[in-house]
Amino acid sequence: MTVPATDSCPAPIRVPAGTTAAAAVRDAGLPGRGAPDAVVVVRDASGTLRDLSWVPDTDAEVVPVAANTDEGRSVIRHSAAHVLAQAVQELFPQAKLGIGPPITDGFYYDFDVPEPFTPEDLDKLEKRMRQIVKEGQLFSRRVYESKEQARAELAGEPYKLELVDDKSGDPDIMEVGGDELTAYDNLNPRTRERVWGDLCRGPHIPTTRHIPAFKLTRSSAAYWRGDQNNASLQRIYGTAWESQEALDDHLRLIEEAQRRDHRKLGSELDLFSFPDEIGSGLAVFHPRGGVVRRELEEYSRRKHIEAGYEFVNTPHITKAQLFHTSGHLDWYADGMFPPMHLDAEYDDDGTVRKPGQDYYLKPMNCPMHTLIYRSRGRSYRELPLRLFEFGTVYRYEKSGVVHGLTRARGFTMDDSHIFCTREQLHGELASLLRFVLELLGDYGLTDFYLELSTKDPDKFVGSDEVWEQATTSLADVAAESGLELVPDPGGAAFYGPKISVQARDALGRSWQMSTIQVDFNFPERFELEYTASDGTRQRPVMIHRALFGSIERFFGILTEHYAGAFPAWLAPVQAVGIPVADEHVPYLESVAAQLKSYGVRVEVDASDDRMAKKIVHHTAQKVPFMLLAGDRDVAAGAVSFRFGDRTQINGVPRDSAVDAIVKWIADRENSVPSAELVKVSSGE
């Protein structure tokens, strides 16, 4: 949960040769320790972040980096991870150090310890960390003269020894990188004696007192460097901020996020579950969840038909050769389920009469859509051809990264593949992006930015020229949208660059939603052609597009965005009748029948519970419209509206109530209904 960072770009300052960056910051009158915008590091002309103790050999112009910026927070969190590691090794001397990087909104550190950490251990560690912070220990950078010196010093730290020779470029490995091998020592501020140290490339804040606010949040198991074949370590997570106020805001957001967790709400609202008997990452939707999912799909299906898409269906498994042709088995095999060897025939003595072949669960729909295109000759008059499918795919996600509906192993993509001419590409991309943004907006997501993922130089197919053309087309369309564009170097799939539409939810969290990917490679691999207007055979361009990402993921995101209180048009139960007493049930059933005639999903609660308990229950179930009826309502042919925010409208004529509910649903209002928003005339 991200508390907004300061985006202002401070003016550069000059650091004279032979003086520290800290002195230049002080002379410039910039904020120091204690202020939320205190300068914690500087960025030099090459873009490298430098400690405030850095002394340039020649005059240097640097940009101050404040604590309340993304970069400043990252430095604070990295330093907090060091303080955590120091506390762990003081309280648990047998602990061996793994890695401890800053991450979004926090930090973690991995440790090899005999027993998992307990909540009581975290309390003790946090207490010791506060003491270290209060001591004001200095972070002091030291350069190793050689790798041999580093190895000798780190002889008791096997995981650090492994990192001395690391050349992976993994951004989570803060220990090494750059031209030098360095350590950061924590020094006693009075004696300058080394208290603790760690292999690290930095940078760091000047002293531990520059960590104004932090908290340890949890611990878990984690494989060394994320590989399940490696040792299992214990990971401690924490968060650190530039002020206590920012930390408190963050913790409130975490608490709210936990309240909105779709896995929790899925159980409470009886929407979906993950039975152990089926397997990790494989969801089943219950009747109420099935209603929401159906409404999500049906509205999307209607909008796609209006936009000129043609619906197709493809099987869940296919022969291995298809994924050899597409390149998936060359580049994506680790993300696929193991093959099934089928079709072999044997003689009675076991001799193979006909060899079998491998089949795979499909991880993507695109190869099959190319076969639909290729099934007959195509003319330029048919292009653009927009194929669309709710296609279920299967990906072998590691168990440690599976997370409810938002990271599953089996899911249904709202998958489209568009085949067009090169001349049509720009217009098709522009209209496609507009379509994506409008449709997501219809579901209540309106705060967007774009991410442009470009070629991974070590993992791509096709020529540089083709990649450049595709990337330029996407960049131009992104610029025309007027939305913020964030670069993602090396983030593209192996077959083409892409634009990702990122949406911010009600808590300000960013979610990757739609992807739009240009692909010149698949048409080559599958030898796709069309007859051009001059009679020549030409290659089409292929555009991959998943608007929701997957139905399951979008379901999970919307569940959290709305905290389970889905808009009435999506809600599994749109209205419920709550009688004051049993004798009022028949009247409410007649109101319900009237609503059902308009297609409203309505129930009447005829249980033995008291009315107050029924209201509490249906409020917890997030039913948008509760209709109450007692003697006066029945006599007047009216109902009383009750809403989730506890507001109420009494004595509404039943026809007016029905009209109001039907209109609210038909208009696809995404706000939560209340006495203030629902326009009806009260009979009182």
UniProtKB/Swiss-Prot annotation:
Which Gene Ontology terms of cellular component type are present? cytoplasm
- Read off the SUPFAM superfamilies from this record: Class II aaRS ABD-related (SSF52954), Class II aaRS and biotin synthetases (SSF55681), ThrRS/AlaRS common domain (SSF55186)
GO BP terms in the entry: threonyl-tRNA aminoacylation
Q: Does the keyword Cytoplasm belong to this entry? A: yes
Reaction catalyzed: tRNA(Thr) + L-threonine + ATP = L-threonyl-tRNA(Thr) + AMP + diphosphate + H(+)
Subcellular locations according to the entry: Cytoplasm
Q: Which cofactors go with this protein?
A: Zn(2+)
| Self-association state and partner proteins as the record states | Homodimer.
NCBIfam families associated with the record: thrS
This protein is called what? Answer: Threonine--tRNA ligase
Organism (species): Mycolicibacterium paratuberculosis (strain ATCC BAA-968 / K-10)
